[in-house]
Amino acid sequence: GHGAVRVAKTALQSGANYLAVATVDEGIKLREGMVGAPIVLLSEPPATAAPLLLAYKIMPSIYTPEFAIAYAEKADEYGIRAPFHLAVNTGMNRIGVRYDNVVDFMRKVSFHRALDLVGTFTHFATADCEGTLDFGIQVKRFTEAISALREVGIDPGIVHCANSAATVRYPQVHFDMVRWGVSLYGLHTCQETRSMINLKPAMSVHARITDTRTLPMSEGVSYGLNYRSPGSVKICTVPVGYADGLNRGLSGRTDFIVDGTRVRQVGNICMDQCMFEVDLRTYGTRRRLDPQIGDEVVIVGRQGD
């Protein structure tokens, strides 16, 4: 991928002061890479992960009393606090305490002195969609949950809910912190954001042609021989396959760039290689490509990146 430690340090150097990870291992990798910023795990791991969370100072999300108590008890053994973020389910129905049950949940677990509520968050299901009805419902539920906590004297801590799309499209939900996700890598989450912010993809993937051949009509290519040559095409091989992240489901459904021209990937993508075709026929003023072994192929990105 992009390199977790490198991305984290770049984000911090650019003004971020908090980091989020998807797994405990990701958090540990950052700590071992000398990243000292606060890290929140955006899920609730198994209770057996509690010692690692505490040792590496990774704050988990909490939404079940069983994990909350196990985590707190382990912290108590060490004589330290157990910081966490409360995940609130406002409609995505993936993880979290139901929005109208947050007070009861906190009362159920807050008897344990080690627990330390550092933040409260939710996640939007439709921030990148055209309609705003469901988005508005989630915002309303989340603000009600935050208000309910405050009304009974529970400080929700850092309030955050804006993913990439919401950060760009809805500044009113920035609250105390935003979670810059896929757009951190220069990707737009929806068409609407393209006119609102200028992003440049952080990654490009290039390869070199390792073999070429001109096939007669009806000759097959790759596993299953699902692709058949229409004749007058050159088949070129590049050393990139599904083991490198080029999804096999994209077989025959994606294009590459050679010498500034789009070329069609053909045949099933192999583990470590794939092929594309180049039409050798000449149409009017269309420039005829004739790629050779060693020529550059752009898998992801633009020519010249």
What are these language model-derived features?
Residues 1-58, 62-71, 169:
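N-terminal active-site wall of soluble small-molecule enzyme domains
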Residues 1-14, 68-82, 90-208, 212-216:
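Active-site loop/helix belt of alpha/beta enzymes
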Residues 16-17, 35-37, 56, 79-82, ...:
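Short coil/turn connectors at secondary-structure junctions
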Residues 23, 43, 124, 163, ...:
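Residues that line or immediately flank small-molecule/substrate-binding pockets and catalytic motifs
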Residues 41, 117, 209, 265-266:
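A structural signal for short, hydrophobic beta-strand segments that form beta-sheets
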Residues 59, 91-94, 237, 275:
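Short aromatic/hydrophobic contact patches that present stacked aromatics
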Residues 212-305:
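C-terminal accessory subdomain/extension
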